[in-house]
């Protein structure tokens, strides 16, 4: 028969499809398996109403056969097959989908299709075969036909359709593989191990058994005996045809059919984790978008989690066929640590399964999963606190950055999941637990920030707050103060840094007395400010300190911990984003009394003392003095 031209598009379009649409050559096998599954679906559906089909559900299968000698890969099915006209229609027109037409007819007939899922975009996925094959041959015998037909093409030049013989109903797709090049090894797709790898990766959950040759080793009797008269055994490699796909996804099974232990084992195998997940979340949603999901909250972060190389996202399936290895659109950034799968028959796919045509369905799924994850984490916090704290110690910072990102858009979602170390209780508490435990006369949520919770709890600035019997939250991550800044308040209680000037702890009488003291010791504070110069924005008499001589507080919106964070950034200007330091003096401390006396009797010595006390305040705040060597010399001068 004369060669026919492709009806829909030119050579250029076919080349564009082959070279551009699919980013991975290996998905050609996924597409051809999906088409085979579609064909079996159709015949299985026919068998429900046509007794002449003569096949039970267990009779259907897909077979993959690699032939290294002839350089061919054959994908066979015993599905409904195609007539010559259907070959013309489905294979001769690029982007025409026979499977799509079948599904529309099925929907229109409003028949019972609970067990019939069509996953193909047949006319498109079929052409992915040309990525690896120099020639594609399709031999198909349609159900109800006595003869078969052969469709053959070597690419965009066209195709031929000729009658041929085939004993059974079904389709064989035979790929004559391209020759290997320096850049591409096409023959690898003929090897049994590679076929198994790709089926496991993309088509493990296709509903029909996929058979292929599997190489195994077995012992055999050599016919020889040893000195003791015992038969000698040898080991040989044998090839047997086996079913290599799981068929029924674990997420499609009920809790009775798949226990939590089964799900955990699945997680460890598929996601290469050695530890049990903190939680397993199962979702079965029906509605505008129907889908099933199985999500896992890991117990530890992947080794590359905090690097640019880490790619978040859930595995996305359509009726058991993997569409994307990692779909980032299914998870908000704040829950990027969650791993798992989503499987939906309702996803709209475009010309390639690797790119979704519309993202509306994904947005609906993502919004629902976000609520499910939040609900599960809230449940853990309430019912299994030890397990939740284990999770939070690993991923709590991620939740905090989730609030900081998008200008606080996720604050309502995440705030109640946060934990901070209580200085009073010496354990992690939520903001709700902190507020519920506050005395009636406590105005603010007090917090202290340092490099570690232990250091934060011991800051000199905490003395006045703790003397009142008020608890303090210990901030120790880069995100903590930014979170407090964005939240502003919780349960109508504002956040207050213990390093702030006004802690709201003084009565009007105490404020008046303090103002009088400030005026009385103004010569001392002026002297220290003049001595320290621009190193401090101000020097004040402290209203916070009890046991320490000095401490640093700040004026303005940038705190000492924020400054530390900004200056740790690559290329940061050390003179930019600086906290406005205020040195506070404790008049009741012997060192400050000695400073004031020296100011009046020996100003030169007093200047040395002022610098030493400032350096001490820096050290207590976790800040290295600008010139440690000078600090050492100043201390020696005082002896």
Give the positions of each predicted feature.
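GHKL/Bergerat-fold ATPase module in large chromosome/replication-associated machines
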Residues: 118, 139-158, 178-639
């Amino acid at each position: 028969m004369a060669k026919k031209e492709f009806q829909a598009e030119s050579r250029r379009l076919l080349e564009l499809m082959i070279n551009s649409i699919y980013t991975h050559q290996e998905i050609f096998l996924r597409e051809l398996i999906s088409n085979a599954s579609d064909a079996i679906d159709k015949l299985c559906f026919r068998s429900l109403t046509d007794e002449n089909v003569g096949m039970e559900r267990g009779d259907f299968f897909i077979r993959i056969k690699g032939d290294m000698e002839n350089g061919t890969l054959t994908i066979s099915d015993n599905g409904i097959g195609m007539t010559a006209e259907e070959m013309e229609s489905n294979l001769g027109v690029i982007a025409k989908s026979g499977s799509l037409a079948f599904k529309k007819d099925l929907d229109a007939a409003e028949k019972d299709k609970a067990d019939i899922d069509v996953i193909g975009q047949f006319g498109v996925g079929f052409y992915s075969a040309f990525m690896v094959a120099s020639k594609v041959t399709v031999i198909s015998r349609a159900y109800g036909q006595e003869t078969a037909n052969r469709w053959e093409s070597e690419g965009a030049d066209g195709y031929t359709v000729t009658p041929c013989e085939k004993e059974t109903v079904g389709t064989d797709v035979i790929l004559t593989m391209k020759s290997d090049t320096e850049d591409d090894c096409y023959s690898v797709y003929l090897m049994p191990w590679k076929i198994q790898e790709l089926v496991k990766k993309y088509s493990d959950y296709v509903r029909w058994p996929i058979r292929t040759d599997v190489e195994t080793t077995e012992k055999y009797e050599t016919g020889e005996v040893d000195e003791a008269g015992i038969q000698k055994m040898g080991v040989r490699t044998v090839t047997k045809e086996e079913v290599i796909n799981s068929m029924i996804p674990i997420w499609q099974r009920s809790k009775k059919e798949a226990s939590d232990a089964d799900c955990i084992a699945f997680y460890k195998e598929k996601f290469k984790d050695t530890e049990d997940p903190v939680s397993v979340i199962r979702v079965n949603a029906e509605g505008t978008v129907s889908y099933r999901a199985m999500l896992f909250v890991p117990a530890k972060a992947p080794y590359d989690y905090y690097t640019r190389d880490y790619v978040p996202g859930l595995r996305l399936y359509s009726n058991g066929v993997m569409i994307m290895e990692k779909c980032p659109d299914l998870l908000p950034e704040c829950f990027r640590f969650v791993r798992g799968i989503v499987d939906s028959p309702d996803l709209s796919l475009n010309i390639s399964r690797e790119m979704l045509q519309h993202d509306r369905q994904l947005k609906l799924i993502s919004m629902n999963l976000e609520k499910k994850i939040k609900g599960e984490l809230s449940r853990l916090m309430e019912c299994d606190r030890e397990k939740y704290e284990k999770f939070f110690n690993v991923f709590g910072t991620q939740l905090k950055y989730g609030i900081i990102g998008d200008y606080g858009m996720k604050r309502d979602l995440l705030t109640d999941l946060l934990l901070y170390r209580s200085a009073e209780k010496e354990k992690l508490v939520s903001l709700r637990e902190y507020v519920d435990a506050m005395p009636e006369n406590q105005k603010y949520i007090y917090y202290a920030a340092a490099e570690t919770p232990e250091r934060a709890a011991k800051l000199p600035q905490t003395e006045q707050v703790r003397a009142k019997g008020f608890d303090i939250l210990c901030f120790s991550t880069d995100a903590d103060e930014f979170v407090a800044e964005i939240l502003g308040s919780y349960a109508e209680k504002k956040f207050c840094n213990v390093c702030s000037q006004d802690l709201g702890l003084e009565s009007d009488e105490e404020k008046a007395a303090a103002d009088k003291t400030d005026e009385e010791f103004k010569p001392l504070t002026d002297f220290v400010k003049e001595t320290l110069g621009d190193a401090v924005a101000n020097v004040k008499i402290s209203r916070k300190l009890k046991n320490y001589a000095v401490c640093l507080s700040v004026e303005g919106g940038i705190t000492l911990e924020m400054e530390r964070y900004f200056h740790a950034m690559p290329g940061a200007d050390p003179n930019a984003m600086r906290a406005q330091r205020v040195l506070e003096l404790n008049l009741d401390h012997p060192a400050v009394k000695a400073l004031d006396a020296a100011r009046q009797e020996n100003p030169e010595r007093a200047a040395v003392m002022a610098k030493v006390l400032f350096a001490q305040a820096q050290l207590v705040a976790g800040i290295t003095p600008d010139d440690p060597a000078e600090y050492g010399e100043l201390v020696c001068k005082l002896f």
